């Protein structure tokens, strides 16, 4: 069975009232129905230490390693966490990201997580013709996104929704994933949009995406 990892990027991930959390639960229900004897691993980013790409943390650690300088005890601890996150990510061929849209982009902790898994010689490599993905063995990613506005009307909001483009390109173009899926619960704070109908549509879209995800 292909292993599945859910990465929950909501800061208030324990609150079931949040729409991205509801999408995550809908995904889990579909999974349990389809694969009753299997389990899903869940990583709650806001309940986990995620090293940051700063000089005191990852940037400083990588610089010391390049210069063959011993790491401090705290740096060793952070690097061990980094390696655990990276190996966990690589071990799962199905990645599901549940997140709200924050200021047209990904939540801050999700960006920190990407910095831990987007690693040269691990998930991609450099060549004379540019970077090449190493995650090419039937890896797929699904984004479960909740947003207050609607971003699929080809209006002024559409080009401002950076999260989908960023995640799609990082996973497929840089790391080499075979497929990127997005399921949107959108317009949840937009006048004239019925939240119940938006969620119903999102769950219908999720069901179809789920079938493609595990085909």
Curated annotation (Swiss-Prot):
Gene3D superfamilies recorded: 3.40.50.360
Cofactor: FMN
Domain of life: Bacteria
Keyword NADP: no
UniProt key word Oxidoreductase: yes
Catalyses which reaction(s): 2 a quinone + NADH + H(+) = 2 a 1,4-benzosemiquinone + NAD(+); N,N-dimethyl-1,4-phenylenediamine + anthranilate + 2 NAD(+) = 2-(4-dimethylaminophenyl)diazenylbenzoate + 2 NADH + 2 H(+)
Keyword vocabulary terms for this entry: Flavoprotein, FMN, NAD, Oxidoreductase
One Gene Ontology molecular-function label: FMN binding
Pfam families the record matches: Flavodoxin_2
Enzyme superclass (EC): oxidoreductase
Cofactor note: Binds 1 FMN per subunit.
Enzyme Commission no: 1.6.5.-, 1.7.1.17
InterPro entries, per the entry: Flavodoxin_fold, Flavoprotein-like_sf, FMN-dep_NADH:Q_OxRdtase_AzoR1, NADH:quinone_OxRdtase_FMN_depd
Family of the protein in this entry: Belongs to the azoreductase type 1 family.
Quaternary structure and partners: Homodimer.
Primary role: Quinone reductase that provides resistance to thiol-specific stress caused by electrophilic quinones.
Protein name: FMN-dependent NADH:quinone oxidoreductase 1
Gene that encodes the chain: azoR1
